[in-house]
Design a protein with these regions (language model features):
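A short hydrophobic beta-strand element
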Residues: 108-117
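A solvent-exposed, acidic/Ser-Thr-rich amphipathic alpha-helical stretch
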Residues: 50-105, 109
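Bacterial N-terminal signal peptides
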Residues: 9-19
Length: 152
């Protein structure tokens, strides 16, 4: 959701195809569990806690996909390590704000979330902002988790 970098990939095209196949569920009706997890991630980030930011919503599996400017990263641990390297100080992390723009239901166990992110990093560092697309999956005994994140 916060880029480790920017990238255009086949993943974007695949997601757009999946979105086109969604149901007639109204746009912007983000499931309450997803909205709650996004708010909890925002709070964890703003508390300087990247591990909790990851634990709250990302699928803790080697198949997790994060796409940014450096290309795809696979796996929960690799994605966590990239975040820790890219945002090594509270100043670099700044204060995170999410705006949830559009939810599309993709069957009974998947959804697609389009949103904006912004980092207010004070006077010392340039503020950052961009968009994200998240593919969510409803996992038994876990609930909704992010299985793919494309952030720019």
């Amino acid at each position: 959701m916060i880029p480790i970098g920017n990238s255009i990939s086949w993943f974007t095209g695949a997601i757009l195809v999946l979105v086109a196949c969604g149901t007639d569920k109204p746009v912007n009706e983000v499931p309450s569990e997803v909205a709650s997890k996004m708010a909890a991630q925002e709070a964890a980030w703003n508390a300087g806690d990247i591990p909790s930011f990851m634990d709250i919503a990302y699928w803790q599996d080697d198949a997790l996909l994060f796409v940014g400017s450096k290309g795809p990263t696979y796996g929960f641990e690799a994605t966590l390590n990239n975040y820790l390297k890219s945002y090594a100080s509270p100043e670099e992390m700044g204060q995170l704000r999410f705006e949830l723009l559009e939810w599309k239901t993709l069957g009974t166990k998947h959804g697609f979330l389009l949103g904006r992110w912004a980092l207010d990093r004070g006077d010392e560092l340039e503020d950052l902002s961009g968009h994200f697309t998240l593919t969510w999956e409803l996992k038994p005994n876990v609930g909704w988790v992010i299985i793919a994140d494309h952030s720019s």
